[in-house]
Amino acid sequence: MALHVLDEANRCLGCKKPLCQQGCPIHTNIPEVIRLLKANQMDAAGQMLFENNPLTTVCSLVCNHENQCEGHCVRNRMPSHDPVHFSIIEDYISTTYANKMTAGPAPKNGMKAAVVGSGPAGLTIAVLLARWGYDVTIFDARDKIGGVMRYGIPNYRLPDSVLDDFQYRHLELKGIKVR
């Protein structure tokens, strides 16, 4: 494990009322993710992140952490202290865990679903529907998935390789079709 990530995790105070989680728009259980990381349960931490947010790898790079989880961190209230930089922790866990993801599609429920658009909302619902057993097809006007993530966010901020990897690990391996 990268030492700088563990050092960052060790800075977490383990608050009883985690303001970081309240500051997260999708209420990621940040204290539990950090606890699992510190307990060397990387797969459990990664699974928790991806179950809560299929786009966790993307969010670790582009989310406005400074005004959300990190901006709400109680360490900000202490003189000359920086918040726990969860963006570093989330990026490390989600990237490491994503590189191991190989599981195939969930058992089918016999129902089909069409998703129009492969932007953040379309990709998220497609992954969730596939988890619930739907046979999912995404319809998009562009050749590559991602919508605003690919065509609106600069490559230096969100590399195309992250979205290409998402397509392989979360769509192709799960049997989600893209047209």
Feature-to-residue mapping (PLM):
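Ferredoxin-type iron-sulfur electron-transfer modules and their immediate structural context
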Residues: M1-K112
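Beta1-alpha1 glycine-rich phosphate/pyrophosphate-binding loop at the start
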Residues: H27-A39, L49-F50, H72, R77-S87, ...
